[in-house]
Amino acid sequence: MASSESRYSPTSLEPKWQQRWQEMGLDQTPEPSAERAENFYALSMFPYPSGNLHMGHVRNYVITDVIARLMRLKGKRVLHPMGWDAFGLPAENAAIERGVDPADWTDRNIAQMREQLQRLGLSIDWSREVATCHSDYYRWTQWLFLQFLNADLAYRKEATVNWDPIDQTVLANEQVDADGRSWRSGALAEKRKLRQWFLKITAVADELLDDLEQLKGWPERVRTMQANWIGRSSGATLRFAIEADGKQAIEVFTTRPDTVFGVSYVVLAPEHDLVDQLTSADQRQAVEAFRQSLQSISEQDRVADDRPKRGVATGGTVQHPFTGQAVPVWIADYVLPDYGTGAVMGVPAHDSRDFAFAKQYDLPITTVVVEPGQAPDSGEPSEAFTGLGELVGSADFDGLQGEEAKTAIIQAAEQRGVGAAKITFRLRDWLISRQRYWGCPIPVIHCDDCGVVPVPESDLPVELPRDVDLSGSGGSPLERATEWKQVRCPKCGKPATRETDTMDTFMCSSWYYLRYTDANNDSAAFTNASIDAWMPVDQYVGGVEHAILHLLYSRFFTKVLQQRNLVSCSEPFQKLLTQGMVQGVTYRNPKTRKYIAPSAVSDPNQPTDPDDGEALEVFFEKMSKSKYNGVDPGAVVDRYGADTARMFILFKAPPEKDLEWDDADVEGQFRFLQRIWRLCDGAKASGLQLQSPLPLPAELTPAETDLRRAVHTAIEAVSDDLQGDELQFNTAVSELMKLSNAMAGQLEAVSTAVAQEAVRSLLLLLAPFAPHLADELWEQLQGSGSIHQQRWPEVDASALVRDTITVVLQVKGKVRGNLEVPAAISKDELEQVALASDVAQKWLEGNAPKRVIVVPGKLVNLVP
């Protein structure tokens, strides 16, 4: 029996191994191989340094760590770095609310979270740590901005922003609540136009869409989300001339030029430049009132499908491009200024949204497309016909169908000079300006004589000034940093001013994976050699909430940098795993809608509100402080150890599914690790050592054959689970449990060589999952070096060969028993064995079956 000194005690052994690994430099990135296939880049999406890890973080980073550890065991040279997405609004808010410096607040949080991550036993190369708020990082973010500027992919233009009329400052979208009010002053936010910086992501829209086909290692839903966001549409632009002068025109884009003869109105975005010109005197007041009513409504709400569409007539008209007839012009909330041309043609008979709008405002509905061979109904239709069909009421184009009709009308529009074929995208250029302090400064200078002048690369970084007043009003806090703002123009030397906007934090996170490849380089953001060695990232892990923006912007950066010969890859991430959320049990009073903390629930089986006795609703939701359903990772590590936390996170659910936290299952994983401890403790007591592999006996006993089969079945299954197209950590842990059960009580019944192979294999398979325990047991059993310096076990195919197999016996499709038969049995022989079995005789009652269905090696089904 094991002594008390040999009890499994993770609280003592885990810190020991974390220190040992650090001293050994075990997690340091080795020099990459010249062969890219020999290198492996494992990466988690880096976190915002809030100061506290949550279980979602743990799941993300443990998944990546298992992959990194596996690849090291398989002989790969692994890059597994970590850093901090450290700019952003929370630090600025903390500075205002608590009177602390954002840099100090952020650095304290980073130190705290780094320690929390290290307690999880993650094999991270901390020598490559980056923080986007440190000038040695954002120097290169600024350098990259200048690359975009030099390539004419960065520009300034007027854009609509949220404006706080009390604080006299611009608000980010996240600073405006659901009612359209400022988060600070409570004032109703207004819309204003300001000159803003943009990156021209639309310049590579085709590549971003087409190259999604290359990303076979990405979840299909993520690729679909990106494709929909990019939203490529083929159609035509058509010009509706303004009757007043005949020179100006409203240009609309449509995917259905075949419906142009059904146009009964044109709709402009309320912000369109031509609205004032087209608005008649008697409609001006109504138009202005409508515009004002949109000030507090977000663009998302304006275009939401479930929201009634509102509009108002301008009183102006335009000329139909084919008939010359006057078409009334309206403005409506569902047309956005920055989408397409900011104008659409209304064809209510053939567009559901236009149909609803026309019905609401009593506008004409004219059918011009019908099912082939069908005459149009008399009177107005009861609903829009949105499919392709045969043209009617379309002058010379009557009788044309579908794509042929579209092509003919586009050609006619081009010949008349009133339109052209066009491809458009839903994707809009990326607005990167932020009127905030805690962000990367935009490295340009404004000169009255020279205009916008890039900061010379030799002057980078443009560092954020310290001791800036963050609580005042009147635009960006950097506007008030007078000494910092006032500079000399790099071109002419005259007085000039710095750009006071900072960059969207996505700018910093769109290239950090490149910096990790050469993180300590003081003279370049990265090098061709470092990119060629490590990029693209082999396995990227992060939440699906980043499916569009972060992942799309990262792809954009990579494509632009490839075009400028700065990187060799066209895509940043080869494989992507989007892990599910971690959910906690949640208690809520159905009457008051108040959430109740689990500690206040006296009986979890029949939970009631301690205040009013109301029976509580019980369900699982994403962990959050407001719902009292969070679990502190530190507390779990304190009680059970990091290895148990890791095992639970990996075992509880497939990685892409949501995981429901269960304390009982955590306890179950702790007991499983204790069983492995006892198993190896018993092997140690019997004198087993792992120092050098012993030769297997020439002849194996049945017990040895069975144990070796269990060992190599586990090696094959775990290897497949960790390297297949779909990573299945949960089933891999199940295989470890099966193997440990097969080994229990059998090590004493087999030769030392077979026992050694079994224990060695079990610990190597366990190592990526429970790295501390695996290394401790490896050391206790005299293994050489660290277990994480060994090689992943290979499957011995001969060990999997069975002399007999188990075949399922069914009668009328229902399982009635099993047959143990020779593995080499023929189909006819298997049928005869089945018919002669006691099970068959019992269920057939001595009668011959009408049919016998034999699936060799699998089953026999007798049909009476």
Curated annotation (Swiss-Prot):
Assign the protein's first listed, main location to one coarse class.
cytoplasm
List, alphabetically, the InterPro entries matched. aa-tRNA-synth_I_CS, aa-tRNA-synth_Ia, Leu-tRNA-ligase, Leu_tRNA-synth_edit, M/V/L/I-tRNA-synth_anticd-bd, Methionyl/Leucyl_tRNA_Synth, Rossmann-like_a/b/a_fold, tRNAsynth_Ia_anticodon-bd
Q: Which UniProt keywords apply?
A: Aminoacyl-tRNA synthetase, ATP-binding, Cytoplasm, Ligase, Nucleotide-binding, Protein biosynthesis
What are its E.C. numbers?
6.1.1.4
Q: Where does the chain bind ATP? A: K625
- Return the annotated region ranges for Disordered: 298-317
- GO MF: aminoacyl-tRNA deacylase activity; ATP binding; leucine-tRNA ligase activity
Query: What GO cellular component entries does it have?
Result: cytosol
Question: What is the residue range of the motif 'KMSKS' region?
Answer: 622-626
Write out the GO biological process terms: leucyl-tRNA aminoacylation
Q: Where is the composition biased (Basic and acidic residues)?
A: 299-309
Where found?
A: Cytoplasm
Q: Which reaction does it catalyse?
A: tRNA(Leu) + L-leucine + ATP = L-leucyl-tRNA(Leu) + AMP + diphosphate
Q: What is this protein called?
A: Leucine--tRNA ligase
Q: What's the gene?
A: leuS
